[in-house]
């Protein structure tokens, strides 16, 4: 059987940063942020060439070990076969190892680009299959769901398959991220979590996660109580004490703040009136960035955009 046909023209994919957990929504809730990696992929006659600019340009591999390349290969297998060669250009703006979904962005960029460059790819790999594939590669759906769908997402596993719904966050919310200079490996942060937690803590988080859906979509004034967490942040504090100290300081000032994903970035959910002031609160050692909310998720764009 003949393999798939590929487009001669390059495709450009833009993928957003994401913040998972958002306090109580451990491994379930995700928010898409207006900070992007751009990837251009072109089918070539032979070989694999990867060019990287920006974040990770000095450390990321430029061969088949690159997560983007591995994700492309996995998607091409599902689409019916591999191209003879690939040229990949990455413009990375999402910090690596900081809890802003850089690995999910690479995975989503790879599988979306593979579908886009394959003629008839949409019919072979629909959006549901994209989410399932991204989750299979990443290991959990919270970041990849937000990266693919944009907005505010709730994801879960059902019968071994990833599922997600997208909601529209309140447009008055202005995310502010505080990025430290030192990375924390996701594996390190996950390794600090206990095998079990007290029932009272699990019950409290369930209530707060439910409240957070209402707060993020309709009633931002409830974000401070809605972002309270008992399941993971305190357990991870030994790996990121400065981050937890900043979260506690911001919350004491009435600002909804959480560890972003597995950390160590801190995410504050401000509004237009307070965002600039909030961004100045971190002090030395932090890169504070006021961001927008992303509504599009992973997108195929014109090369000149």
Swiss-Prot record:
> Which key words tag this protein in UniProt?
Amino-acid biosynthesis, ATP-binding, Cytoplasm, Kinase, Nucleotide-binding, Threonine biosynthesis, Transferase
As one GO molecular function, the record gives: ATP binding
Report the EC number(s), separated by commas if there are several. 2.7.1.39
Disulfide bond as a keyword?
no
What pathway annotation does it carry?
A: Amino-acid biosynthesis; L-threonine biosynthesis; L-threonine from L-aspartate: step 4/5
Under catalytic activity, the entry for this protein gives: L-homoserine + ATP = O-phospho-L-homoserine + ADP + H(+)
Q: What is this protein called?
A: Homoserine kinase
